[in-house]
């Protein structure tokens, strides 16, 4: 995508009467009771392994947006490779359900990768991550020298879908 695509999509959303009707409770928020105080925007490039968004199951009640911070661009490229070559496969095996993955190209947090996953509920999410941490493939991957020092920290933001959510 480019800036032209961004503007076309934005106009398409604003022209979508179904979207606008579903979002009306959000649009009706007032200053004393805002939906948010501000928001951040990121431009991300999709990973080769998951080049487009995957739609979550309708049973989802929990999304997790994770950000992995790297010390420099080279370490970040190795983290992207780690996901593309190995890590996403382990996610699939243990029930960490993918929506999208991206390398941050522009935004307030760089260098970094971000990805969104979904779960039926919090206990299901916790069980999937326990399986991930114990999985033999992860135990092997996390100790490979080519993936050493790829992320300095990670953060998670937990989200709940609203009636007007497109996912």
Regions found by a protein language model. Name each.
Residues 1-138, 147-167:
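Short S/T/G/P-rich N-terminal loop/turn motif that feeds into the first structured element of a domain
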């Amino acid at each position: 995508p480019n800036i032209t695509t961004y503007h076309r999509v934005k106009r398409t959303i604003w022209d979508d009467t179904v979207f606008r009707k579903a979002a009306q409770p959000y649009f009706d928020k007032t200053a004393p009771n805002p939906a948010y105080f501000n928001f951040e925007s990121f431009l991300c490039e999709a990973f080769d392994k998951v080049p487009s968004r995957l739609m979550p199951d309708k049973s989802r009640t929990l999304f997790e947006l994770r950000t992995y911070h790297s010390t420099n661009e080279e370490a970040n490229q190795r983290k992207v490779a780690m996901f593309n070559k190995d890590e996403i496969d382990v996610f699939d095996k243990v029930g960490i359900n993918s929506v999208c993955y991206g390398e941050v190209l522009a935004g307030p947090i760089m260098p970094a990768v971000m990805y969104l996953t979904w779960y039926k509920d919090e206990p299901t999410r916790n069980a999937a991550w326990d399986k991930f941490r114990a999985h033999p493939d992860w135990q092997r991957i996390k100790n490979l020298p080519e993936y050493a020092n790829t992320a300095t920290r990670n953060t998670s933001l937990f989200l709940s879908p609203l009636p007007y959510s497109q996912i």
